[in-house]
Amino acid sequence: GSEMCIRDSHIPEPDNLFDDFSYRGTAIREQTLTLYKNLSHSILVGDPGELGELSPDQRKAWDAYRSKFSKPYQAMNLNWSDQSRELSRFKYQSLLKNFLASGAGIDKNVGRIRAFLQENDLADNTVVIYMADHGFFLGEHGFFDKRFMYEEALRTAFIVHWPGKVEEGVVNDRDIVSNIDIASTFLEMAGIEIPQEIQGRSMVPVLEGKTPDDWRKTFLYTYHELANHNVCLLYTSDAADETC
């Protein structure tokens, strides 16, 4: 199927796959997003702890599936800790093929949802939105993951099908919207009053091609310190590892 076509393909590399940070600022020189150094085996093939939850038959099927894609790496005869360009290229191909295979699976299942709406006469009365909470580096600058403030991590997918409201095929790459706008947008779509204290603004006029003159032109992004999500870290005289 589509996944095997992806697996058998060679994905073109971005021009800046081997970006040089040696002459740049501290933040980019000390980031932990590089393919050659930070993309581990477990990220590509799954954490061993997670695989331990599989039944023997499931594990056998998983190992057989993965072996088809590990053979090229084994043929390279490189250590996973090696920082050569050959291993970086292998990691890039593996990352992109995993990503594209996942995207193909999403596309297939979005199609199933759309088909259900059509078959049950719901398509004209349903808003379908595909979105993500962040962008992702796919080899650009030699990176994977997110967080670093480059275009690839800041831009996110936000695709809207709203019959009678949003013109098909129109792309808006000018106006700045944010995930804080989503709640207000959904409320207006549903005809519900938007509370004054809510953050963000409804994107409905933007989606309709009627962006207000006072729509935001700038925004601030920060990501710093100890990035332990949902954990409050307290500094002490000895360390910063106590939680509250």
Model-identified regions with their sequence ranges:
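Hydrophobic side chains within alpha-helical segments
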Residues: 110-112, 184, 244
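Proline-centered helix-kink/hinge sites
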Residues: 157, 163, 183-184, 239-240
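Residues that cap or initiate secondary-structure elements
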Residues: 164-166, 226, 243
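Active-site-proximal cap/lid insertion segments
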Residues: 2-177, 189-197
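Single conserved hydrophobic/aromatic residue that forms the stacking wall/gate
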Residues: 1-8, 235-244
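C-terminal cap/loop subdomain of S1 sulfatases and analogous C-terminal strand-loop tails that border
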Residues: 134-140, 180-183, 188-237
